[in-house]
């Protein structure tokens, strides 16, 4: 990479060397641990000297005056590098701080994050302010730079002009480009996207793909364009196809694609047991998926499926750091590396008893030390949503002949509307509901029907969508208006109304798309929302992703976008949005 922000200054390095020479005392000593060494693939009994945020010595010696140093006795315990999530979407109604604060207790302390939310919600100048704010936290955040907005908007050149893309690509905290949700545009001749990819490569940074179901020929083309890794393999065969073409592969286990166990079983059935080009990712799962942690759960699955322990842990740390050319800084418990590591009671149990990140103890002997601080989101323009308009009955006029039918939680296909949808209350005898999408600025709307969402949801409104525009779904127009009014009143969020009452709400104070509340509170509210929707006929796995992907044109077949109802396969607007 062209520039790195985590280099220590000369005086810091001199002080670290002085610690090795016993001229200064370490700030933390870990004694008698069995340390995972990924270079020799062995557990080695060592003492670890840490000075502030850096590991300065790993070996058999103890420092002078060791009794004066804060010491953790690791006799009989194992030390592994802090876990890395290489593909995070950190605003899935939670936010990067609260997510990290929660999952770091389970050992994940480095996050490579999507910047799409910041591009759409924070503005060109303020978005990078958030990166600096998050550096104050005791975990490590890196980012990727989007080449497209993952939906059809009216002004993409304004939201994502080349100068903004270039600014992100060249930022030292940005370590990759992608993910390539807009790759069909690239194949069709989008030279601006190719130019951005070339700019990424000139910075010696990686490019993340997004190639679900891609053929060998498509994968080959993407390699020629510059893609390095893909997280969309869903079977053992798809993993092998990518490996054979020279890709690194992120094995995904997310709330909508929990594939890791199945993939490992299929690879092992083929006799394939070579893991050096594999990572894990949870690909931005929704809150309840992380109830028991993040990367630790994927390591557990790998261990249960017979992956050797050292390989299972390398896939969570060393392999990722090496891929991003950061193994001199992360992913190794060794001299010169950042002091981010996990202390385990047993290598077969990836839940750490003690967690260090950037030299700070986040968890000790099973206790959360509350090391995080509040992030000032206002500096980055992430404030409560202020709508300048109200939804009215005029916004709930439905005459379109075609609606969207849910095949699963995220795949939508067209269907012809046959019921009478001119009334204010629809019957509970079918699973068709009104669907309206409103511009957050009040300029346009899209009205259609959605089939398969639920049979008895009366009024459901969310400002959590890909673009932050407002979606309203329901059987009863009055309850839809009530839910909208409450969503507006609380500054954005997800609201469920029924029979003139508010049943449930999730306030989303960060532009109406992410919560500022503690992760545990968000998790509890999301679970209650799932339960209420399930009771009313929602049959799929993840309503949060249903809301997010209604607009997302990287998935087939039909999407509700700011431009109107969009045919993804034909790349055309079937029914344009209507000016209000």
Swiss-Prot record:
Membrane spanning residue stretches: none
First and last residue of the signal peptide: none
Residue numbers bearing the Phosphoserine modification: 399
EC number of the protein: 3.5.4.2
Gene3D superfamilies: Metal-dependent hydrolases, Urease, subunit C, domain 1
Enzyme class, broadest EC rank: hydrolase
GO molecular function: adenine deaminase activity
InterPro entries membership: Adenine_deam, Adenine_deam_C, Amidohydro-rel, Metal-dep_hydrolase_composite, Metal_Hydrolase
GO biological process assignments: adenine catabolic process
Reaction catalysed by this enzyme: adenine + H2O + H(+) = hypoxanthine + NH4(+)
Keywords assigned by UniProt, alphabetized: Hydrolase, Phosphoprotein
PANTHER family in alphabetical order: ADENINE DEAMINASE YERA-RELATED, N-ACETYLGLUCOSAMINE-6-PHOSPHATE DEACETYLASE
Family: Belongs to the metallo-dependent hydrolases superfamily. Adenine deaminase family.
Protein name: Putative adenine deaminase YerA
Species of origin: Bacillus subtilis (strain 168)
């Amino acid at each position: 990479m062209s520039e790195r922000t985590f280099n220590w200054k000369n005086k810091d390095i001199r002080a670290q060397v002085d610690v090795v020479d016993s001229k200064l005392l370490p700030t933390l000593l870990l004694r008698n641990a069995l340390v995972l060494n990924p270079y020799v693939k062995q557990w080695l009994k060592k003492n670890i000297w840490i000075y502030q945020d850096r590991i300065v010595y790993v070996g058999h010696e103890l420092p002078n005056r060791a009794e004066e140093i804060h010491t953790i006795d690791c006799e009989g315990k194992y030390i592994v590098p802090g876990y890395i999530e290489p593909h995070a979407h950190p605003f899935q109604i939670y936010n990067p701080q609260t997510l990290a604060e929660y999952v770091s207790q389970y050992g994940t302390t480095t996050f490579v994050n999507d910047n799409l939310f910041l591009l759409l919600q924070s503005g060109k100048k303020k978005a990078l302010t958030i990166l600096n704010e998050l550096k104050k936290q005791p975990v490590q955040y890196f980012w990727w730079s989007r080449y497209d907005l993952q939906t059809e908007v009216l002004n993409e050149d304004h939201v994502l002009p080349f100068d903004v893309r270039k600014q992100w690509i060249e930022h030292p905290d940005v370590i990759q480009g992608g993910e390539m949700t807009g790759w069909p545009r690239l194949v069709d001749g989008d030279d601006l996207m190719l130019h951005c990819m070339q700019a990424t490569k000139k910075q010696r940074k990686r490019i993340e793909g997004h190639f679900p179901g891609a053929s060998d020929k498509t994968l080959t083309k993407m390699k020629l364009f510059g893609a390095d890794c893909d997280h969309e393999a869903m079977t053992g065969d798809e993993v092998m196809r990518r490996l054979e073409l020279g890709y690194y592969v992120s094995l995904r286990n997310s709330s909508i694609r929990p594939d890791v166990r199945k993939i490992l079983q299929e690879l092992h059935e083929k006799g394939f047991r070579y893991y050096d080009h594999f990572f894990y990712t949870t690909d931005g799962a929704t809150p309840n998926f992380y109830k028991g942690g993040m990367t630790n759960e994927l390591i557990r699955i790998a261990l249960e499926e017979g992956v050797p322990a050292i390989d299972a842990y390398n896939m969570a740390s060393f392999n990722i750091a090496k891929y991003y050319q950061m193994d001199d800084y992360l992913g190794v418990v060794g001299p010169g590396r950042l002091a981010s590591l996990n202390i385990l009671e047993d290598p077969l149990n990836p839940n750490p008893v003690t967690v260090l990140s950037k030299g700070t103890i986040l968890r000790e002997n099973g206790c959360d030390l509350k090391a995080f601080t509040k992030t000032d989101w206002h500096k980055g323009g992430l404030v409560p949503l202020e709508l300048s308009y109200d939804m009215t009955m005029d916004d709930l006029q439905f005459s379109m002949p075609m609606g969207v039918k849910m095949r699963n939680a995220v795949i939508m296909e067209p269907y012809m509307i046959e019921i009478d949808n001119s009334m204010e209350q629809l019957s509970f005898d079918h699973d068709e509901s009104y669907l309206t999408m409103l511009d957050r600025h009040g300029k346009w709307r899209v009205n259609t029907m959605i089939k398969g969402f639920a049979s008895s949801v009366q009024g459901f409104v969310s400002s959590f969508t890909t673009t932050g525009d407002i979606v309203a779904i329901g059987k009863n127009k009055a309850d839809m208006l009530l839910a909208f009014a409450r969503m507006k009143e609380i500054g954005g969020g997800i609201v469920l109304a029924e029979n003139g009452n508010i049943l449930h709400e999730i306030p989303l104070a960060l532009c109406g798309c992410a919560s500022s509340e503690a992760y545990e509170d968000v998790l509890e509210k999301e679970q209650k929302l799932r339960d209420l929707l399930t009771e009313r006929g929602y049959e799929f796995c993840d309503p949060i992703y249903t809301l997010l992907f209604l607009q997302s044109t990287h998935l087939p077949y039909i999407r509700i976008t700011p431009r109107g109802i969009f045919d993804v396969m034909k790349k055309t607007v079937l029914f344009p949005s209507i000016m209000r």
